[in-house]
Amino acid sequence: MRDPVSSQYSSFLFWRMPIPELDLSELEGLGLSDTSTYKIQDSSAAKMTGKAPGAEQEKNPEGDALLEYSTFNFWRAPIASIHSFELDLL
């Protein structure tokens, strides 16, 4: 069994820089006045209520102004475009 005292300081979570708090006034300055969408949700509270983290997003069908900058869309490989003449070669 590992010694909890020595493993505490070798942890990545102990030595990394803390994530800064989000200043909601900066979002309002960018024109995103509806800051209720961007509030931090506690995952344990979501587990207790039985709601999935994405359930609130499904309630908002008009879309999100920052949706194109989500981590999934930003870091995924672009979809390859296949033209009709390339398809004929297959």
Curated annotation (Swiss-Prot):
Using the UniProt record, give the first listed, main subcellular location: nucleus
Q: What is known about its processing and modification?
A: Ubiquitinated, leading to degradation.
Q: Say if the entry is tagged with keyword Membrane.
A: no
The residue ranges crossing the membrane are: none
Report the locations given in the UniProt record: Nucleus; Cytoplasm; Cytoplasm, Cytoskeleton, Microtubule organizing center, Centrosome
Q: Where is this motif: Nuclear export signal?
A: 24-32
Q: Which Pfam families match?
A: WRNPLPNID (PF15017)
Kindly list the GO CC terms recorded for this protein. centrosome; cytosol; nucleoplasm
Q: Which GO terms describe its biological process?
A: extrinsic apoptotic signaling pathway; intrinsic apoptotic signaling pathway; positive regulation of apoptotic process; positive regulation of DNA-templated transcription; positive regulation of mitochondrial depolarization; positive regulation of release of cytochrome c from mitochondria
Q: Which InterPro entries match?
A: MLLT11_fam, WRNPLPNID
> Is Metal-binding there in the keyword field?
no
Q: Which residues carry this modification: Phosphoserine?
A: 84
Q: Which UniProt keywords apply?
A: Cytoplasm, Cytoskeleton, Nucleus, Phosphoprotein, Ubl conjugation
Family, similarity comment: Belongs to the MLLT11 family.
The record's subunit annotation is: Interacts with HSPA8 and LAMP2 isoform A; the interaction may target MLLT11 for degradation via chaperone-mediated autophagy. Interacts with TCF7.
Q: What does this protein do?
A: Cofactor for the transcription factor TCF7. Involved in regulation of lymphoid development by driving multipotent hematopoietic progenitor cells towards a T-cell fate.
What is the name of this protein?
Answer: Protein AF1q
Organism of origin is Bos taurus (Bovine)
The gene name reads MLLT11
